[in-house]
């Protein structure tokens, strides 16, 4: 199914540790020194809202205008932080798709836990990873549809044997797609129909299609 022109979807992946604080954070806020280990001082860790609560606010204002998507009290939340203490990132000001850095058990075709489109000026803690850096929201929405396909999750399952989604390695068998209006896939269709287009594009046999359709749960 894969050929010499194959390009992996992981080219669009931004890992769980790619959002970081600036180097001078603890010069600006010396009172925060010692709250986190020296090796993780710039990390926007999964528990950063509890570790450094002074930096984060429940709603945006003129200064605190960057959202950080994370978890608090076992729920997904967005907290707001000053732009001046967040390092530059390729998709901070772009549309992207966020999904958990860990999910499930590694079983082939398992459902991915509630991926979503991330708006510009929203980053994330180490709980999440992201795909893409789009000026056009529609392209991010189409990438989200691709992530929900049975085809993609089957290809992901060929390498993913644990709960971890964050490494490029586990995504290396997933082919990249064109999410623009020039794509050979009609992304405006239902996810079920998109799967049928992908089966045809990659010349899957009827046995392969039957396997995917019987083993892989649909995602809404």
Describe these PLM feature segments:
Residues 128:
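Short hydrophobic/aromatic beta-strand or adjacent loop that forms the aromatic wall/cage
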Residues 1-125, 134-185, 189-206:
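C-terminal substrate-recognition regions of SAM-dependent nucleic acid methyltransferases
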């Amino acid at each position: 199914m894969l050929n010499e022109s194959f390009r992996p979807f992981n080219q669009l992946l931004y890992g769980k540790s790619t959002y970081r604080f600036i180097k001078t954070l603890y010069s600006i806020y010396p009172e925060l020194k010692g709250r986190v280990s020296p090796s993780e001082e710039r990390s926007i860790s999964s528990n950063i809202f509890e570790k450094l609560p002074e930096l984060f606010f429940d709603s945006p204002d003129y200064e605190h205008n960057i959202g950080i998507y994370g978890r608090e009290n076992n729920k997904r939340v967005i907290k707001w932080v000053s732009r001046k203490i967040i390092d530059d990132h390729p998709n901070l000001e772009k549309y992207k798709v966020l999904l958990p850095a860990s999910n499930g058990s590694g079983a082939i075709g398992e459902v991915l836990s509630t991926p979503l489109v991330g708006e510009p000026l929203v980053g994330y803690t180490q709980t999440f990873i992201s795909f893409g850096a789009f000026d056009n929201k529609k392209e991010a929405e189409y990438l989200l549809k691709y992530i929900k396909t049975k085809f993609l999750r089957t290809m992901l399952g060929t390498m993913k044997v644990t709960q971890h989604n964050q490494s490029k390695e586990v995504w290396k068998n997933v082919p990249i797609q064109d999410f623009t209006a020039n794509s050979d896939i009609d992304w405006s269709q239902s996810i079920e129909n998109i799967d049928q287009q992908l089966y045809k594009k990659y010349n899957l046999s009827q046995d392969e299609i039957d396997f995917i359709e019987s083993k892989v749960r649909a995602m809404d």
